[in-house]
A protein has these predicted regions:
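Deubiquitinase catalytic domains
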Residues: 97-190
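Active-site-proximal helix-loop elements at catalytic-domain edges
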Residues: 1-13
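Papain-like cysteine protease catalytic cores
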Residues: 11-133
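N-terminal low-hydrophobic presequence detector
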Residues: 1-3, 49, 190
Length: 190
């Protein structure tokens, strides 16, 4: 099991990266975390989501792409569709296992199983009236798996973390009210 799987649940408070803004998609408010590109962005985003930093990016790339390479016959047809060409086992190793080619739907679907995560990819585009719109691609491992939300815009993945600031403030206010009620009860019982 990859490092950090059991221990880490991402929130904006424990990511070792600055957020680069907010975005509202459907009814959810997300913080956006940009990651380095260069063909590694999805692996960087997955590492940031699972461990809170980028330290496992190459490990995740190696685990995911080696699984495909080692079972190439099983994934070959899917690879032809996702890589838009007949890719040989040798070429796959050079481009994906040891290289820095972008991940495709094949690598993402394998990542869900290896990283035991549901991966939601939000594709940012424009509708017929030039309004920003989003399309969601879901890669599901299981209903019990953690959810990782990614934004894909201009061929670059960014991590999305649900912004729970409002929920945290509400929770704090609720706790403060409960505390003051208890304090008042104690005061009046004296």
């Amino acid at each position: 099991m990859p490092m950090g799987y059991e221990k880490f649940k991402p929130s904006q408070n424990n990511l070792n990266a600055p957020n680069s803004g907010r975005i509202k998609i459907e009814s959810e408010d997300f913080l956006i975390y940009d990651v380095p590109g260069g063909g590694q962005c999805i692996f960087h985003a997955l590492s940031l989501a699972i461990t809170g930093n980028l330290s496992q990016s190459l490990v995740y790339r190696s685990l995911i792409c080696s699984e495909i390479y080692n079972n190439f016959d099983f994934y070959e047809d899917q690879l032809k569709l996702s890589h838009h060409s007949n890719i040989s086992r040798h070429a796959y190793r050079n481009k994906m296992v040891h290289g820095n080619q972008w991940a495709t739907s094949t690598e993402i679907s394998v990542a869900t199983r290896i990283l035991q995560s549901n991966i939601n990819i939000w594709l940012q585009g424009r509708d017929g009236h030039s309004n920003i719109c989003f399309t969601k691609e879901e890669y599901i491992n299981s209903s019990l798996s953690r959810n990782v939300d990614l934004l894909l815009h201009q061929n670059h993945f960014k991590l999305l973390i649900k912004n729970s600031t409002e929920k945290m403030v509400s929770s704090f206010i609720r706790q403060a009210l409960q505390y003051s009620r208890k304090a008042m009860k104690i005061h009046f019982q004296k």
